Amino acid sequence: TVTLLLDIAYIDYAGERQAVRKFFKKISNLPANILTIVAYSMSKGFTMYGQRTGAMIGVSSSKEVIDEFKGINQYTSRATWSNINRPAMKTLATVYKDPELLAAVQKERNDYYEMIKARADLFMKEANECGLKCLPYIAGFFLSIPDTDPEAVCSKLHDDNIFAVPLKAGIRIALCAVPLKKIGGMAAKIKAAQDAVHK
């Protein structure tokens, strides 16, 4: 059996609601030897960070595979985590029972998506203008900038009060945490820090 894990933690911030979910059709009739596991994070989609609530959904064309998936998880998940937290379960049930509340939640998610997209659009435009090389940005809370010495570049950025996250092979910028007014000029400062470190 081949297991495919789809991490959809940030799907609510990845684009137009229906468009970003179209790929689910591709996993509905796969061969019986493929089990797709969809990992969903309620803490992201419902902006409930710290609540540690989500779902692991198994999808297979084989009833036998799904029965095994269900049986295994019924015991191992319960033994590992006991039960998920009650306030998050209650929130989910309350929101989905009330069409007006659900519409308000979906509007709020879309507003956050548009806010982050505006930040990304500005950053990528300025990165292009100043020659800062970035990985392509499609959607999400973060963008990445390749670098061979991310620790040194991030340390240099502290001089400009920019606190990025050094990764193994680059720098992560948290678009979700930086207001639009502070995005302007950031790409040029990162490029200058890279140039200073790699001169």
Regions found by a protein language model. Give the residues of each.
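Catalytic PLP-binding core of fold-type I/II PLP enzymes
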Residues: 1-20
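Conserved core segment of the aminotransferase class I/II
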Residues: 28-107
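Active-site-proximal loop/turn and secondary-structure-junction residues that shape catalytic pockets
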Residues: 10-12, 43, 170
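PLP-dependent enzyme catalytic core of the Aspartate aminotransferase-like
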Residues: 86, 151-199
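Structural preference for beta-strand elements that scaffold enzyme active sites
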Residues: 3-5, 37, 142, 170
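Conserved PLP-binding catalytic core of the aspartate aminotransferase-like
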Residues: 104-157, 177
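Short beta-strand
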Residues: 39, 133-138, 164-167
